[in-house]
Amino acid sequence: AVYEAVNSGLLVITGGPGTGKTMIQRVILDIYRSKHPDAKIVCCAPTGRAARRMEQSTGMPATTIHKALGLLAGDDGSYCEAEMLEADLVLVDEVSMMDVYLAGHLFRSIPRGCQLVLIGDADQLPSVGPGAVLSEIIACGEVPVVRLDKIFRQSYGSRIAANAKLIRHGNLSLEYGEDFQFFESADLAVSANLIEELYLQETARFGVDNVALLSPYRQKTETGIN
């Protein structure tokens, strides 16, 4: 992925959580800066939060795509024409969050000779706006794509990673074991007691700071977040 990014005019790098996308960004930037110390590099992402995370993880200044392109919203909600980027390398993270309009502005603003690297997870939900940009770029077959499929965030043989992949492909024949368990209960009160018991058990084992308790319900119910 790093070799292709440094030596290609356009590249897509896609992979799920924990496959090394962030590490690859850092390595791409380190190698590119060592080869081209005077190069102008633009790091950007569709949202402010994603841009801040990109800046923290790479150590390079990062901004939103809108700000990088000088896109200002008018009173009617439309945007002015984007500015042409002054860059030798443009690195875009979280591309799956980019809609077709923002992608159009970005691609028209890439100067001739500039290298463009698009990074994201094609299996994430598409953008709120129209167009599944990342998935459609990959599907067109005209753009070089590097797929990261080895997961480093979980241990080798993790059922969490294996089951996430099965679910993404609509397969519910999941694998169960110590690191992936399922408890079925039709009674909310029984479920709440079971959750409390499991939480106390796991916090005693791993410590409070290392155990997360999540609920799909915001409402104040037996299994809500209250």
Outline where the language-model segments fall.
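Pre-Walker A (Motif I) flank of P-loop NTPase domains
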Residues: 7-13
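Inter-Walker segment of RecA-like/P-loop motor cores
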Residues: 40-89
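Conserved lysine of the Walker
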Residues: 21
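Walker B catalytic acidic pair
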Residues: 93-94, 120
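The conserved Walker
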Residues: 17, 95
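N-terminal pre-P-loop "Q-motif" helix
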Residues: 1-7
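Hydrophobic positions on the alpha1 helix immediately C-terminal to the Walker A/P-loop
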Residues: 24, 28
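Conserved helicase motor core of P-loop NTPases
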Residues: 4, 123-226
